[in-house]
Amino acid sequence: MTDILNCTKSEEIFSAAQELMPGGVSSPVRAFKSVGGQPIVFDRVKGPFAWDIDGNRYIDYIGSWGPAICGHAHPEVTTALQEAIEKGTSFGAPCVLENKLAEMVIDAVPSVEMVRFVNSGTEACMAVLRLMRAFTGRDKVIKFDGCYHGHADMFLVKAGSGVATLGLPDSPGVPRTTTANTLTAPYNDLEAVKKLFSENPDAISGVILEPIVGNAGFITPEPGFLEGLRELTTENGSLLVFDEVMTGFRISYGGAQEKFGVTPDLTTLGKVIGGGLPVGAYGGKKEIMSMVAPSGPVYQAGTLSGNPLAMTAGIKTLELLKQEGTYEKLDAITSRLIEGIIQSAENNGIAIYGGSVSAMFGFFLCDGPVRNFDEAKTNDAKLFGKLHREMLRRGVYLAPSPFEAGFTSLAHNEEEIDKTIEVFDQCFNTIKNQ
């Protein structure tokens, strides 16, 4: 690991990519617009490490944005995939692997009695929204400022006070008529949710949220918040939906609902359950899921849904996670990391607020607490950009945005954690004087 990395090939490839793909990327955050500097182009990944096309090695705390909880290219996962690929890459028909992964998900996640596999978290959230409306016969849905549920039109609603509840679109091309039924509230604010129910009697199909917000940084639920949502939705004949695409199988084997002891009506999943391959899922009570076609009238379909390679990687990943001591290790290393980051910042006189839950962590460069998206936006984005660039040039790969959670894996050991803390200390010392 060196202090200054040569990224000439990355620069050349990214320059060419900008003529071929919008912004040079297949997903916006990868373009480094939030942090400045030049994106790196990956060549390979293994364990807790990533190597770019120039041969530089990084300690990786993105993990493909969450799926790589066992570490990149875990040998048991890759071996299983090598065996599976000999049988074909896609069936477009039922296969026993779907049954096996479905049974594992149902056994693990408290709310899930029946599950449908799709191809992404966005797909899962799109489908669950349609199902919420069909089951309740109501059109409106409550989401929270800063919570991300994929790029479907209904969820791309501007966050913030004033315009939030008016349903103004957050992207050109999204009609106001589409978002008019999306109501928003600040995360961790039960009174705001009560007000929305009061103002929209018998009109709200349900409440959807990230039980731990990972797409506005890292924000945890205040004591009583999730429990309060469960009570409010039940009282108003609405559904409670946990978007566990990020938290599912990451913060505990049964996800956030197991961790916090609050069971929603429906759950969306993704990332970890595909072991690094494209996948999503939604599930819940049989009474609700039985409305999904072909059992019921709520249509949803997909050419690659239940793909045998994704099912194979997911099964092996969950088998690894179910082993004794898995989440204890993840909690220990992640706690060690965030405590070291916070201590390093404080030692250098830099304001910081952060935390972790199992294999998920985050921090804001501001005074805390951070309980919602408005408070998250007090983060010093300019300073974070400087920090990100300094960390990168010293071989530590953080999410290129102050509004994304970080991830550890079973492949991260004390050696990588301690080296990372050392690099944070160096970088905080550097940027405090810039």
Swiss-Prot record:
<dbReference type="GO" id="GO:0042286">
    <property type="term" value="F:glutamate-1-semialdehyde 2,1-aminomutase activity"/>
</dbReference>
<dbReference type="InterPro" id="IPR004639">
    <property type="entry name" value="4pyrrol_synth_GluAld_NH2Trfase"/>
</dbReference>
<keyword id="KW-0663">Pyridoxal phosphate</keyword>
<dbReference type="InterPro" id="IPR015424">
    <property type="entry name" value="PyrdxlP-dep_Trfase"/>
</dbReference>
<keyword id="KW-0413">Isomerase</keyword>
<feature type="modified residue" description="N6-(pyridoxal phosphate)lysine">
    <location>
        <position position="271"/>
    </location>
</feature>
<comment type="subunit">
    <text>Homodimer.</text>
</comment>
<comment type="pathway">
    <text>Porphyrin-containing compound metabolism; chlorophyll biosynthesis.</text>
</comment>
<dbReference type="GO" id="GO:0030170">
    <property type="term" value="F:pyridoxal phosphate binding"/>
</dbReference>
<dbReference type="InterPro" id="IPR049704">
    <property type="entry name" value="Aminotrans_3_PPA_site"/>
</dbReference>
<dbReference type="GO" id="GO:0015995">
    <property type="term" value="P:chlorophyll biosynthetic process"/>
</dbReference>
<comment type="pathway">
    <text>Porphyrin-containing compound metabolism; protoporphyrin-IX biosynthesis; 5-aminolevulinate from L-glutamyl-tRNA(Glu): step 2/2.</text>
</comment>
<keyword id="KW-0149">Chlorophyll biosynthesis</keyword>
<keyword id="KW-0963">Cytoplasm</keyword>
<dbReference type="Pfam" id="PF00202">
    <property type="entry name" value="Aminotran_3"/>
</dbReference>
<dbReference type="InterPro" id="IPR005814">
    <property type="entry name" value="Aminotrans_3"/>
</dbReference>
<dbReference type="InterPro" id="IPR015422">
    <property type="entry name" value="PyrdxlP-dep_Trfase_small"/>
</dbReference>
<comment type="similarity">
    <text>Belongs to the class-III pyridoxal-phosphate-dependent aminotransferase family. HemL subfamily.</text>
</comment>
<dbReference type="GO" id="GO:0008483">
    <property type="term" value="F:transaminase activity"/>
</dbReference>
<keyword id="KW-0627">Porphyrin biosynthesis</keyword>
<protein>
    <recommendedName>
        <fullName>Glutamate-1-semialdehyde 2,1-aminomutase</fullName>
        <ecNumber>5.4.3.8</ecNumber>
    </recommendedName>
</protein>
<dbReference type="InterPro" id="IPR015421">
    <property type="entry name" value="PyrdxlP-dep_Trfase_major"/>
</dbReference>
<dbReference type="GO" id="GO:0005737">
    <property type="term" value="C:cytoplasm"/>
</dbReference>
<dbReference type="GO" id="GO:0006782">
    <property type="term" value="P:protoporphyrinogen IX biosynthetic process"/>
</dbReference>
